């Protein structure tokens, strides 16, 4: 606050600017995933079928309409017909890949791979953004989480977690973050700072090494990258 960065009590209210405690999706001290929170309570519904261990090949397009999907399970193709609609929600990488394998995307690129064009949609796979990050680890003169990571203390933390769902192992690694502006006149933050109360370095093989002396790690992330990439089919 002394340097003009406010405390942000709720960074999900439309304004991220400031320093804030990180929210965690937890229940009873354990991580609560989307599957835990939303699928588990309704798994027995008669109108819901959950298929695991499967990967979608493509959407079935008939007369400019999505009528189903073809997916692979145990390497065998399975065709599934849709009664109403097909919703593509496979993430940044796989959503455009599925669309392009289905003939929806940049026509010239689809023809390169011998895919019949259903819809020439040049924007599919474009505008990929990567949030570059650098980190700095420092030893400090105040107690941090590092002092709690010795082998004997970790046994106690593990028991506290298993028996009471409390303690160190229930906390997210990054507990405090800040959304900052590199220039005061910017309308929105363009830098994100993450703070970890333990130093994490990497050895020559790229393995993470956790410092057990009092230390901190700071991650600096580009929030609004200007460079753009793309997702393309390899085959």
Question: How would you describe each model-predicted region?
Answer:
Residues 54, 58-63, 73-75, 132, ...:
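Short, flexible loop/turn elements at secondary-structure junctions
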Residues 1-66, 70-72, 135-158:
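Conserved redox-cofactor binding core of oxidoreductases
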Residues 8, 49-51, 116-120, 194:
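General small-molecule cofactor/ligand-binding pocket signal
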Residues 137-234:
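FAD cofactor-binding and catalytic pocket of flavoenzymes
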Residues 52-55, 65, 113, 124, ...:
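Residues that flank catalytic or metal-binding motifs in active/ligand-binding sites
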Residues 59-62, 67-158, 168:
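Glycine-rich loop(s) and the adjacent beta-strand/alpha-helix scaffold that form part
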Residues 25-28, 97, 121, 162-167, ...:
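Active-site rim elements
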């Amino acid at each position: 606050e002394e340097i003009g960065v406010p405390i942000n009590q709720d960074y999900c209210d439309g304004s991220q600017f400031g320093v804030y405690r990180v929210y965690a999706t937890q229940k009873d001290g354990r991580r609560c995933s989307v599957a835990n929170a939303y699928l588990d309570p309704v798994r027995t519904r008669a109108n819901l079928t959950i298929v695991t261990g499967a990967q979608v090949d493509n959407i079935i397009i008939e007369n400019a309409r999505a009528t189903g999907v073809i997916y692979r399970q145990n390497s065998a193709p399975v065709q599934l017909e849709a009664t109403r609609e097909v919703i593509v929600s496979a993430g940044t990488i796989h959503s455009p890949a599925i669309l392009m394998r289905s003939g929806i995307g940049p026509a010239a690129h689809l023809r390169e791979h011998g895919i019949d064009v259903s819809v020439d949609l040049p924007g599919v796979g474009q505008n990929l953004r990567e949030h570059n990050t650098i980190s700095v680890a420092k030893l400090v003169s105040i107690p941090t989480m590092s002092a709690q990571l010795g082998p004997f203390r970790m046994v106690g933390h593990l028991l506290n977690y298993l028996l009471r769902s409390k303690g160190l192992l229930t906390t997210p690694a990054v507990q405090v973050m800040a959304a900052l502006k590199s220039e005061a006149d910017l309308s929105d933050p363009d830098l994100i700072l993450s703070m970890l109360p333990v130093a994490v370095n990497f050895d020559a093989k790229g393995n993470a090494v956790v410092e057990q002396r009092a230390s901190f790690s700071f991650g600096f992330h580009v929030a609004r990258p200007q460079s753009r990439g793309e997702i393309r089919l390899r085959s």
